[in-house]
Amino acid sequence: MIVRTIDEIIGTENEVESDTWTSRRLLLEKDGMGFSFHETIIYAGTETHIHYQNHLEAVYCVGGDGEIETVSDGKVYPIQDGTMYALDQHDEHYPRGGKTDMRLICTFNPPLVGTETHDENGVYPLLSKQPVGK
């Protein structure tokens, strides 16, 4: 059994920060679960361009507010506590923090190894050896 707390992650290499978000990576590829599991904070009033070309992601909001815009059709979806969205088509998108920081619980398939950050196109590199959907 794997048991971890957020306090064990904060301040370690498994807490990755940018100007617009912080990702606390609780499960990674090395844990052998077939997915990675993260707590991500999107800062209030910020916008981030993301396009996970190599990963599928499911996200559940557990606090705060914001929105997500899909680039392909310009649709904007409000996000608040209790909202789930899944990027099942490698959707290019813009998560935006609202009036308060948005706290999200995220899973990635294939799992992240832990060192990934977005490149200039909003893409995480594929570092996992596991194929998408397996």
UniProtKB/Swiss-Prot annotation:
Top EC class of this enzyme: lyase
InterPro entries the record matches: Ectoine_synth, RmlC-like_jellyroll, RmlC_Cupin_sf
Catalysed reactions, as listed in the record: (2S)-4-acetamido-2-aminobutanoate = L-ectoine + H2O
Reported induction: By osmotic stress.
Keyword terms of this UniProt record: Lyase, Stress response
EC number(s) from the headed UniProt entry: 4.2.1.108
Keyword Lyase carried by entry: yes
Job of this protein: Catalyzes the circularization of gamma-N-acetyl-alpha,gamma-diaminobutyric acid (ADABA) to ectoine (1,4,5,6-tetrahydro-2-methyl-4-pyrimidine carboxylic acid), which is an excellent osmoprotectant.
Family under the similarity heading: Belongs to the ectoine synthase family.
Name of this chain's protein: L-ectoine synthase
Taxonomic source organism: Sporosarcina pasteurii (Bacillus pasteurii)
